[in-house]
Regions:
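Residue-level signal for cytosolic alpha-helical hairpin/rod architecture
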Residues: 81-82, 100, 111, 123, ...
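Alpha-helical solenoid repeats of the armadillo/HEAT superfamily
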Residues: 91-105, 133-149, 160-161, 173-191, ...
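Internal amphipathic alpha-helical repeat/solenoid segments
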Residues: 75-98, 106-136
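Buried hydrophobic core positions in alpha-solenoid tandem helical repeats
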Residues: 83-85, 125-127, 166-168, 186, ...
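Intrinsically disordered, low-complexity regulatory regions
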Residues: 1-86, 91-92, 100-104, 430-431, ...
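C-terminal per-repeat helix/turn "cap" of leucine-rich repeat
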Residues: 116, 122, 129, 157, ...
């Protein structure tokens, strides 16, 4: 190819191109050598290896520390809890799981106190962990919050840091243990009036009412117990009973029939508290609450029977329910309880209240007396479980029944037994027993046949009481 250059100029250009090629090759070589040297230097690999090492080191250190603290038998000093806060805030999921579980175990075993948790600033990190996407972390932190909520100071801290809403969210969780721990925490937050008001304001009542229908018996118990605590304050009743179509009362009546004894017992307690409201009572009677109640009163479980008889005595205080209770055969159930060998002072005392209430209506007096309730009351007087207070309660009931003129004649077969107890009460040094015995005698003497059965020992004891009273009167005059 003819370039028009002479041989000399063409050679000069050729030499220049060769020099440039040599320079380029040397530059590339030098560049490769530089990059290789840079990549082999530890200063450029430091951040990556450090980050990897940091995560592994944190996890290993956390596990070692937490495993060691779990084996410590004595309560931990607050200084040993300082690492927990840092570990709770870790971005490593395994560290969060291990830390929250360890803290839950320490709280459960009373190795750390709620005050220590507050002091070390761990309440807020725990509440943040409630909002984790990991169910294990949610379970563990929920258990921690539930245990903390048993303390007054911790309850206030949980509320002030916005812990109610996360707990209500977790109470709707599909994970059974997450839900269980959240409802447990809500229950403990109802243990003080102040925190309870905040719960109700944040919408806890509908959530707790819905949880009564849970398939988890512990969730049922926690939610029912929380509702019982809330029901202790009548100002919350409108919200509780305002859930449509008597939802709460129906759910509680269903829970009364639970095979889990403590759940049925708690349902009776909650209904008893709510039944102080006349409107609630009308709804309960309309829902035939007396039918399941009859079975529970005869339960072989003493706590359940006591809870049921407490509910019955509360229902009987309202005039609207008395006839219905008699019509469903409640007096027969009471008779069986009195004549049975399984009873307690609580059962007897509430039976007495029920008998007095049912007999206050004229049409029920004969029903009460013609049943074997009177025989049962007399039998209860000599029961081994009968305390002094119970004896006084039974005697008051007998005195009440005797005050009805038209039923005194029904007592005639029992005069001898009644007189024995009147004599015992007259010999008692407590004035209240003596006064009750004298009042009962006054009512019995309305029947002319009663004077025939009065014993000489009874008359002598009356004279002694009169003499004691006279001496007391004379001494008082000298003051």
């Amino acid at each position: 190819m003819d370039t028009g250059l002479c041989k000399k100029c063409a050679q000069l250009l050729k030499n220049l191109v060769a020099s440039l090629n040599q320079l380029a090759a040397g530059f590339v070589k030098k560049m490769k050598e530089c990059m290789t040297a840079l990549s082999n230097c530890s200063c450029l690999r430091k951040n990556k290896s450090s980050a990897t090492y940091s995560v592994q080191q944190e996890r290993q250190a956390a596990c070692a520390l937490l495993d060691h603290l779990d084996t410590v038998e004595s309560p931990l000093h607050v200084a040993l809890l300082e690492p927990y806060r840092t570990l709770l805030l870790s971005s490593d999921l395994e560290v969060q799981r291990k830390t929250s579980l360890s803290l839950a175990n320490l709280l459960f075993k009373n190795k750390v106190s709620a005050e220590q948790i507050i002091e070390t600033g761990m309440v807020l990190p725990l509440l943040e962990r409630l909002q984790s996407w990991d169910p294990t972390v949610q379970r563990n932190s929920g258990q921690c919050v539930a245990l903390l909520a048993s303390s007054d100071s911790s309850r206030e801290a949980i509320l002030s840091m916005g812990g109610v809403i996360p707990l209500l969210v977790l109470a709707k969780s599909y994970d059974p243990l997450v839900q269980q721990n959240a409802v447990w925490a809500l229950l403990n937050l109802t243990l003080s009036e102040g925190t309870m008001k905040v719960l109700c304001r944040e919408g806890a009542i509908p959530v707790l009412a819905l949880l009564l229908q849970s398939s988890n018996y512990k969730v049922q118990f926690y939610s029912c117990s929380a509702l019982s605590n809330i029901a202790m304050f009548p100002e919350h009743h409108p919200k509780m009973l305002g859930i449509g179509d008597s939802f709460l009362l129906k759910s509680l009546l269903t829970l009364m029939s639970s095979s889990v004894e403590k759940n049925a017992t708690q349902a009776c307690r909650c209904l008893r508290i709510l039944s102080g409201n006349v409107g609630t009572l009308e709804q309960l009677m309309h829902l035939d609450c007396a039918l399941p109640l009859k079975k529970l009163i005869c339960s072989p479980s003493l706590p359940l029977a006591e809870a049921a008889i407490r509910l019955l005595s509360e229902l009987s205080t309202h005039e609207l329910s008395r006839t219905s209770l008699v019509n469903v055969g409640m007096l027969h159930v009471i008779e069986q309880l009195l004549l049975g060998d399984k009873s307690s002072p609580i059962i007897i005392e509430h039976i007495v209240v029920t008998i007095i209430n049912l007999s206050s209506a004229c049409e029920e007096q004969q029903a009460v007396m013609y049943r074997k309730c009177l025989t049962g009351l007399l039998q209860a007087l000599v029961s081994s479980v009968t305390s002094e207070e119970t004896v006084l309660c039974i005697t008051s009931c007998l005195h009440h029944l005797i005050s009805y003129d038209n039923v005194i004649k029904l007592l005639k077969p029992h005069y001898a037994t009644i007189l024995e107890y009147i004599l015992l009460y007259l010999k008692n040094q407590e004035v209240r027993f003596q006064q009750l015995a004298i009042e009962t005698l006054c009512n019995l003497k309305k029947d002319q046949d009663f004077s025939v059965v009065m014993s000489s020992s009874l008359e002598e004891q009356l004279k002694m009481v009169h003499a004691q009273t006279e001496r007391t009167r004379l001494l008082l005059q000298k003051i």
